[in-house]
Design a protein with these regions (language model features):
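Acidic, Ser/Pro/Thr-rich low-complexity regulatory regions
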Residues: 1-115
């Protein structure tokens, strides 16, 4: 079985539904940590919300709805500096989009993290 994280996803040829669901769960976790100030925006960008990550996910034919969340996550720095009163609302909106999308994926039946 495969181990999954945002970094290991880049070594895959394509993304299946399980991989996309795990990616979404990671993204929602990053947004939750960002919203509660457990991580900085810079950390979130280093982990997930960068044009590089977006490009790699697009190359892997990632679900366009996930790509949209990542793209909007890349815009958080601009929002924080230009319209700071909207910053946390945008994080919450992205988190809610991610949660709604996670629910559309099928149940994960395998223990993919074990070898």
């Amino acid at each position: 079985m495969k181990k999954l994280s945002i970094i290991t996803i880049f070594s895959m040829n394509s993304l299946d539904e399980t991989t996309e669901k795990v990616l979404l769960i990671e993204i929602v976790g990053i947004l939750e940590a960002l919203e509660s100030n457990a991580i900085s925006l810079n950390e979130a960008e280093n982990i997930c919300f960068s044009p590089y990550i977006q490009k790699k996910l697009k190359e892997k034919k990632c679900n366009p709805e996930i790509l949209e969340i990542v793209e909007r996550g890349c815009e958080l720095e601009d929002i924080k500096s230009l319209i700071p009163e909207s910053y946390y609302k945008n994080i919450a909106d992205l988190k809610n989009l991610g949660l709604a999308l996670v629910g559309k994926y099928p149940f994960i039946h395998s223990s993919f993290w074990r070898e």
